[in-house]
A protein has these predicted regions:
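Short hydrophobic/Thr-rich beta-strand motif most characteristic of the beta2 strand and flanking loop
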Residues: 27-33
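Acidic di-acidic motifs
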Residues: 8-9
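Catalytic beta-strand/loop cores that center a nucleophilic Ser/Cys/Thr
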Residues: 112-159
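Acyltransferase
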Residues: 172-211
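Cysteine-nucleophile active-site neighborhood
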Residues: 43-117, 122, 181
Length: 211
């Protein structure tokens, strides 16, 4: 069982993410972003930085926690705001996205590796954000997924176990969210999560068109 630290960026989605992780067999400790004990990070098998309002600079210790994960090589997954924080840690610029999206679906195309292993491309995902990483600025990270209009939807570090997704894997609007999280749990030392994710799906049906 992977022992996870979930950094809560004061967001209502965090407990849905935790429910997904626990359903896949992991244990999760949820801590608000302003009370994170950075020294304890290496005692966890993985760290998830949750969605939340505002910018990475206003996300408490999230940026510092990601830096600590990089230093200790602790697997880290950033979701939405957490993804943006990961981009900023490695030199990326986060600015206003071309359009604000809240509860909208988009089709993304991904590289089929890491978080996206075993998932079809194109893939339908649920988006809730007004900011995005500028693609030309994330030179220290590999862009793993984009929308058809070029918005960065996924990144990973080329050498460290650090991943980010701009969309919400836990949303019912996202196809294959359980498998994405299971892929990350496998990197955290819990490969049996892949079997636990089998057959689990969102509550609605999808076609390949963005809403």
């Amino acid at each position: 069982m992977a022992k996870l630290l979930v950094i809560d960026n004061y967001d209502s989605f965090v407990y849905t993410l935790v429910d997904y992780l626990r359903l896949l067999g992991a244990s999760a400790t949820v801590v608000r972003n302003d009370v994170v004990d950075l020294a304890s990070i290496s005692s966890y098998d993985g760290v998830l930085a949750s969605p939340g309002p505002g910018t990475p600079a206003k996300a408490g210790a999230t940026v510092a926690a990601i830096e600590q994960c990089a230093q200790t090589k602790t697997p880290m997954l950033g979701v939405c705001l957490g993804h943006q924080a990961l981009a900023e840690v490695f030199g990326g610029v986060v600015s206003h996205a071309p359009t604000l999206v809240h509860g909208k679906t988009s089709v993304i195309r991904h590289n089929g590796r890491g978080l996206f292993e075993g998932l079809p491309s194109p893939l339908t995902v649920g988006r809730y954000h007004s900011l995005a990483a500028e693609p030309d600025t994330v030179r220290e990270l590999v862009i793993t997924a984009r929308t058809d209009d070029g918005i960065v939807m996924g990144v990973e570090h080329s050498e460290l176990p650090l991943w980010g997704v701009q969309f919400h894997p836990e949303s019912v609007l996202t196809q294959g969210g359980h498998r994405m999280l299971a892929n990350w749990l496998a990197a955290c030392g819990q490969p049996e999560a892949l079997e636990a994710a089998r057959g689990k799906a969102p509550l609605i049906r999808f076609d390949e068109r963005a809403s």
